Each structure stands twice: as C-alpha cells, then as structure tokens.
Amino acid sequence: MKKDIHPVYQEVEVHCACGNNFKTGSTNKEIRVEICSQCHPFFTGKQKNVEKGGRVEKFKKRFGM
C-alpha cells in the first residue's frame, strides 16, 4: 500500500439532536445526527403500526363490498 494517501481513522464523538452523545470511529472530526438509537421510535418501542391496506381493500371500500 502507498504511504500517506489514506485518511486518518480516529475516534470521534457523535452528537444527536436529542442531546445524546456517543463515540465511534470515523475519518470525520465530528458527526451530528438528527435521530439516534436513544430517540428513534423503533428502538424506544413507541413506533406506530400503520396498515394502509392494499388494492383489494381500496376497491372494496370504494364500491361498498
């Protein structure tokens, strides 16, 4: 491999909009995210299960079947 052409991989701190901070490895100096595992609905258990239905359900609803 060639020397001095690869970016420096270092430990950085990730800042979430909810206020949570954690460390990870990256070539960037700082990372800011809007959603992390502490505030995402899937990981917190607050997700909503929305079922829209398919084409058949829309057809039946439209024509009163």
Curated annotation (Swiss-Prot):
State the disulfide connectivity: none
Q: How is the cofactor bound?
A: Binds 1 zinc ion per subunit.
Cofactor(s) this protein requires = Zn(2+)
Query: Gene Ontology terms, cellular component aspect?
Result: ribonucleoprotein complex; ribosome
Q: Please name the PANTHER family in this protein's record.
A: 50S RIBOSOMAL PROTEIN L31, CHLOROPLASTIC (PTHR33280), LARGE RIBOSOMAL SUBUNIT PROTEIN BL31C (PTHR33280:SF1)
Question: What family is reported?
Answer: Belongs to the bacterial ribosomal protein bL31 family. Type A subfamily.
Name of the protein described by the UniProt record: Large ribosomal subunit protein bL31
* Gene that encodes it: rpmE
